[in-house]
């Protein structure tokens, strides 16, 4: 395992990747009758683990594409299956340009599996499909079209009918068992229960993701495509993300931060076939990965992603962002220097450097005569406030665009957290969440505006 630095980013933007040995299903994949040796236009990467029957269905839909089979390839990346997955892949060698890569089962490592598949891919475009996604017959054609033309798309989020793991519809199973994907869409394509659960978010911006502040929230790799060069430019999937959930959104965050635009394609659709899920385990795993997200990208938006996901209200991240913008506007100009001084006065004398975090630091978060041996971490949800913050000559001050709902620091990292009155607005909505987080990271917490000091 090694780290890849993301150019132009500080150390948190270091992506963990592995270099596993790949094992193509044959030393040489026999060409299909009539196939040419030209480089495929698209590589479809499918991670899988012990879902041979679902994989068979996904590959079956890719074998009936309107695009000539020699123009695209399929790479199945196996996360350590013990079922007949390898045999399923072999059964498609005469119908698809297909490759297979296997990695040892060391737990849920879908990020590593996708990277392994992407390394084996040879096309300039990568598409990621989840096992169990039933591609429409024009899926490949539509992906290629979306990335072509005078203004080709960079990242394309393909729609996925039937995807709502929280509330799977009882009719979905019989529908996809009885009909091919295109007939299923013809019959119930307009039914509310059949829609991609992201549809309300896309509709709200007329499917123009440039109008979204956080399009990366909807970068879900059950159906997505992008140039291979852009995928590797940002480091691919971060393999520190193990277990279910979040690794795709974190990649979307880095793509967006690099200025790579995202679009939605309703034409390159698939249907997610229903399958068993371990919902409680998935939620627990997702929260661990949300925590990793905050530690790797310590700023307000990943913090809000963690906070709303922790409350089970994932779709409201944008709502919370707007609320914090309003609270920042209301608190602009509010000075809390006296409150910070009161908090610092509670520190006992020490010969060692003491670490102090301030939630709601404001513009002037530095005492005129700062206490010696104190390292200040000034946190505020108003990024404009932090941009105006002056640093101290000795470098003992750092600024963080965080509210305090979830911070990147380990338990008991600080000697003291000071929560100021600039947090009054957020506290009305989030209650004791800030105090709870403060007690997690510090041995002492002071809230001068609440104590009456």
From Swiss-Prot:
Catalysed reaction equations from the record: validoxylamine A + UDP-alpha-D-glucose = validamycin A + UDP + H(+)
E.C. number: 2.4.1.338
Major enzyme class: transferase
Gene: vldK
GO molecular function: metal ion binding; transferase activity
Transmembrane annotation, as ranges: none
Entry comment, domain topic: Instead of having the common DXD motif at the position 130-132, it contains a DTG sequence, which may provide greater metal ion binding flexibility.
Keyword Manganese recorded: yes
Similarity comment text for this entry: Belongs to the glycosyltransferase 2 family.
Record keywords, A-Z: Antibiotic biosynthesis, Manganese, Metal-binding, Transferase
Keyword Transferase applies: yes
Gene Ontology biological-process entries: antibiotic biosynthetic process
Pfam families to which the protein is assigned, alphabetical: Glyco_transf_7C, Glycos_transf_2
Protein name per UniProt: Validoxylamine A glucosyltransferase
Known cofactor(s): Mn(2+)
UniProt cross-references to PANTHER family, sorted A to Z: GLYCOSYLTRANSFERASE (PTHR43685), SLR2126 PROTEIN (PTHR43685:SF3)
Physiological role: Involved in the biosynthesis of the antifungal agent validamycin A. Catalyzes the final attachment of glucose from UDP-alpha-D-glucose to validoxylamine A to yield validamycin A.
């Amino acid at each position: 395992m090694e780290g890849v630095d993301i150019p132009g980013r500080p150390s948190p933007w270091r992506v963990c990747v592995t270099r596993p040995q790949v094992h193509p299903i044959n030393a040489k994949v026999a060409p299909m009758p009539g196939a040419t040796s030209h480089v495929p236009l698209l590589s479809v990467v499918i991670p899988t683990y012990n879902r041979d029957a679902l994989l068979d269905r996904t590959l079956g839909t890719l074998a009936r594409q309107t695009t000539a089979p020699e123009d695209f390839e399929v790479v199945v990346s196996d996360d350590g299956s013990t079922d007949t997955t390898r045999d399923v892949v072999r059964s498609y060698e005469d119908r698809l340009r297909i490759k297979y890569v296997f990695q040892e089962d060391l737990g849920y490592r879908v990020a590593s599996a996708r990277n392994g598949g992407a390394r084996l891919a040879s096309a300039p475009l990568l598409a990621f499909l989840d096992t169990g996604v039933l591609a429409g017959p024009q899926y490949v054609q539509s992906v290629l079209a979306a990335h072509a033309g005078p203004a080709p798309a960079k990242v394309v989020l393909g729609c996925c009918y039937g995807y709502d793991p929280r509330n799977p519809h009882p009719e979905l199973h019989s529908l996809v068992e009885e009909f091919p994907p295109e007939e299923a869409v013809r019959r119930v394509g307009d039914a509310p229960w059949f829609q991609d659960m992201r549809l309300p978010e896309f509709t709200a911006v007329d499917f123009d993701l440039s109008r979204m502040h956080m399009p990366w929230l909807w970068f879900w790799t059950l159906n997505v495509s992008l140039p291979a060069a852009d995928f590797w430019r940002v480091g691919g999937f971060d393999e520190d993300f193990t277990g279910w959930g979040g690794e795709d959104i974190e990649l979307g965050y880095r793509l967006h931060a690099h200025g790579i635009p995202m679009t939605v394609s309703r034409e390159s659709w698939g249907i997610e076939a229903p399958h068993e899920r371990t919902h409680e385990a998935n939620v627990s795993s997702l929260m661990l990965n949300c925590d990793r997200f905050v530690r790797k990208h310590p700023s307000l938006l990943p913090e809000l992603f963690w906070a709303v996901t922790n409350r089970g209200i994932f779709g409201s991240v944008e709502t919370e962002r707007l609320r914090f913008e309003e609270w920042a506007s209301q608190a602009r100009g509010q000075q809390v220097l006296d409150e910070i001084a009161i908090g610092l006065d509670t520190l006992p004398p020490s010969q060692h450097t003491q670490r102090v975090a301030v939630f709601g630091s404001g513009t002037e978060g530095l005492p005129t005569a700062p206490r010696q041996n104190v390292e200040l971490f000034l946190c505020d949800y108003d990024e404009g406030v932090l941009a105006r913050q002056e640093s101290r000559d000795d470098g003992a001050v750092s600024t963080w665009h965080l509210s305090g709902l979830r911070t990147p620091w380990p338990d008991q990292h600080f000697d003291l957290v000071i929560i100021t009155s600039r947090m009054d607005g957020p506290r009305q909505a989030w209650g004791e969440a800030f105090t709870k987080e403060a007690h997690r990271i510090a041995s002492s917490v002071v809230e001068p505006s609440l104590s009456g000091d």
